[in-house]
Amino acid sequence: MKCNKCGATLTDSSFCNNCGANVKIYKKLISTSNALYNRGLEKAQVRDLSGARDDLKNSLKVYKRNIPARNLLGLVYFEMGDVVAALSEWIVSKNYQPEDNIADKYIEAVQNNVGKLDAYNMALKKYNQALLYARTGSLDLAVIQLKKVLSIHDKFVSAHLLLALVAIETNQIELARKELKKVLHID
């Protein structure tokens, strides 16, 4: 662990041996952030993506420069179908640690597959349109739009959830059940 003031390697002491700064609270922040990251990692490994997302976001609230937590949060967002949020996390990670950062590979992988990136963007636009239809009461149009979204991007958790909600509202209980099972499979 490095001192947040001078960058020197810290010891077990509550003070930096190099600059004399009190690092007791800083060490506690890092420890708490890492504990939340580890919990998020465990949840991600068993595909509890929503739980992992929450723990990783809390880890970053405690210490925003936790690069492994930020990169994993990006992966969780990507797995949940939120490519924009994933890219945002990886870009922030890259800005905090420009060298030796696996976020480079993630960003490159997404950007090199332009066709897939365009498909994700199209799915997001259609999802937003479906959301507008649902809010204005055009539930049949929302269902049509959401089915198009999911044909483009089948791991888009928010689209599955909105389709389930609209299906419940239109008394299509079997469709809602099917969509919720898909969400449970993804997350």
Label each residue range with its predicted role.
Residues K24, L60-K61, V92-N95, L150-S151, ...:
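Conserved structural position within tetratricopeptide repeats
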Residues Q45, E79, N113-K116, R135, ...:
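Register position in tetratricopeptide repeats
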Residues G20-L29:
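Short Cys/His-rich micro-motifs in 6-15 aa windows
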